[in-house]
Protein backbone atom coordinates (compact mmCIF):
# COMPACT_ATOMS: atom_id res chain seq x y z
CA UNK A 1 0.00 0.00 0.00
CA UNK A 2 1.11 3.55 -0.59
CA UNK A 3 -0.71 4.76 2.50
CA UNK A 4 1.87 4.26 5.21
CA UNK A 5 2.46 4.98 8.86
CA UNK A 6 6.03 5.85 9.79
CA UNK A 7 7.84 4.40 12.80
CA UNK A 8 7.15 7.69 14.58
CA UNK A 9 3.42 7.42 13.88
CA UNK A 10 3.11 9.92 11.02
CA UNK A 11 0.58 8.80 8.41
CA UNK A 12 1.06 9.76 4.78
CA UNK A 13 0.44 8.70 1.22
CA UNK A 14 3.70 8.02 -0.61
CA UNK A 15 4.33 8.17 -4.35
CA UNK A 16 5.69 4.66 -4.00
CA UNK A 17 7.07 2.29 -1.40
CA UNK A 18 10.56 0.96 -0.71
CA UNK A 19 9.51 -2.61 -1.56
CA UNK A 20 9.19 -1.57 -5.20
CA UNK A 21 12.88 -0.62 -5.29
CA UNK A 22 14.03 -4.14 -4.38
CA UNK A 23 15.63 -5.62 -7.48
CA UNK A 24 15.34 -2.33 -9.38
CA UNK A 25 18.33 -0.55 -7.87
CA UNK A 26 19.95 -0.07 -11.29
CA UNK A 27 17.04 2.13 -12.37
CA UNK A 28 17.86 4.82 -9.79
CA UNK A 29 20.84 7.06 -9.08
CA UNK A 30 20.35 7.67 -5.37
CA UNK A 31 18.40 6.97 -2.22
CA UNK A 32 17.57 9.82 0.14
CA UNK A 33 16.87 8.70 3.68
CA UNK A 34 15.12 11.25 5.83
CA UNK A 35 15.42 10.39 9.48
CA UNK A 36 13.69 11.74 12.52
CA UNK A 37 12.48 10.56 15.88
CA UNK A 38 11.79 7.08 14.52
CA UNK A 39 15.19 5.61 15.34
CA UNK A 40 14.42 4.81 18.99
CA UNK A 41 11.71 2.43 17.79
CA UNK A 42 13.60 1.07 14.77
CA UNK A 43 14.80 -1.96 16.74
CA UNK A 44 11.19 -2.75 17.68
CA UNK A 45 10.28 -2.76 13.99
CA UNK A 46 13.48 -4.06 12.39
CA UNK A 47 11.79 -7.34 11.50
CA UNK A 48 8.89 -5.68 9.70
CA UNK A 49 8.87 -6.24 5.92
CA UNK A 50 9.24 -2.53 5.14
CA UNK A 51 12.39 -2.24 7.26
CA UNK A 52 13.83 -5.47 5.85
CA UNK A 53 13.24 -4.01 2.38
CA UNK A 54 14.80 -0.70 3.45
CA UNK A 55 17.98 -2.38 4.66
CA UNK A 56 18.14 -4.53 1.53
CA UNK A 57 17.87 -1.48 -0.72
CA UNK A 58 20.45 0.50 1.28
CA UNK A 59 22.86 -2.45 1.09
CA UNK A 60 22.31 -2.91 -2.66
CA UNK A 61 22.78 0.80 -3.37
CA UNK A 62 25.89 0.94 -1.21
CA UNK A 63 27.46 -2.15 -2.74
CA UNK A 64 26.88 -0.72 -6.22
CA UNK A 65 28.51 2.57 -5.21
CA UNK A 66 25.25 4.43 -5.74
CA UNK A 67 24.58 7.65 -3.90
CA UNK A 68 23.20 7.39 -0.36
CA UNK A 69 22.02 10.66 1.16
CA UNK A 70 20.67 11.17 4.65
CA UNK A 71 20.66 13.07 7.88
CA UNK A 72 20.37 12.40 11.61
CA UNK A 73 20.76 8.64 12.10
CA UNK A 74 20.80 7.83 8.38
CA UNK A 75 24.54 7.20 8.64
CA UNK A 76 23.79 4.67 11.36
CA UNK A 77 21.38 2.81 9.08
CA UNK A 78 23.93 2.94 6.26
CA UNK A 79 26.39 1.43 8.76
CA UNK A 80 23.89 -1.27 9.80
CA UNK A 81 23.48 -2.09 6.10
CA UNK A 82 27.22 -2.74 5.96
CA UNK A 83 28.18 -0.14 3.36
CA UNK A 84 30.26 2.35 5.36
CA UNK A 85 33.55 0.52 5.92
CA UNK A 86 36.23 3.18 6.45
CA UNK A 87 33.89 6.03 5.46
CA UNK A 88 33.37 9.21 7.49
CA UNK A 89 29.77 9.85 8.53
CA UNK A 90 28.14 12.96 9.97
CA UNK A 91 25.52 11.57 12.35
CA UNK A 92 23.38 12.75 15.23
CA UNK A 93 25.45 12.71 18.44
CA UNK A 94 23.17 10.06 19.96
CA UNK A 95 23.82 7.75 16.99
CA UNK A 96 27.63 8.03 17.15
CA UNK A 97 28.17 5.08 19.52
CA UNK A 98 26.27 2.75 17.18
CA UNK A 99 28.65 3.33 14.26
CA UNK A 100 30.96 0.30 14.03
CA UNK A 101 32.13 0.07 10.41
CA UNK A 102 32.36 3.70 9.38
CA UNK A 103 33.84 6.60 11.31
CA UNK A 104 31.33 8.87 13.05
CA UNK A 105 32.43 12.51 13.03
CA UNK A 106 31.33 15.69 14.76
CA UNK A 107 31.07 17.40 11.37
CA UNK A 108 27.81 19.18 10.56
CA UNK A 109 27.76 17.36 7.23
CA UNK A 110 30.12 15.43 5.08
CA UNK A 111 30.69 13.66 1.81
CA UNK A 112 32.83 10.54 1.64
CA UNK A 113 32.66 8.83 -1.71
CA UNK A 114 29.02 8.04 -2.45
CA UNK A 115 27.85 8.76 1.12
CA UNK A 116 26.33 12.18 1.83
CA UNK A 117 25.41 12.66 5.49
CA UNK A 118 24.36 15.50 7.76
CA UNK A 119 24.23 15.57 11.54
CA UNK A 120 20.57 16.59 11.57
CA UNK A 121 17.95 18.45 9.56
CA UNK A 122 19.45 21.83 10.48
CA UNK A 123 22.58 21.00 8.48
CA UNK A 124 21.17 19.28 5.40
CA UNK A 125 21.60 22.55 3.49
CA UNK A 126 25.38 22.43 4.03
CA UNK A 127 25.75 19.35 1.83
CA UNK A 128 23.21 20.31 -0.83
CA UNK A 129 25.70 21.97 -3.21
CA UNK A 130 27.62 18.67 -3.38
CA UNK A 131 24.41 16.65 -3.74
CA UNK A 132 23.26 18.84 -6.63
CA UNK A 133 26.62 18.44 -8.40
CA UNK A 134 26.40 14.65 -8.45
CA UNK A 135 22.71 14.45 -9.33
CA UNK A 136 22.95 16.65 -12.46
Description of each model-found segment:
Residues 1-68, 76-88, 96-136:
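Extended, subdomain-level signal for the structured scaffold at the beginning of enzyme domains
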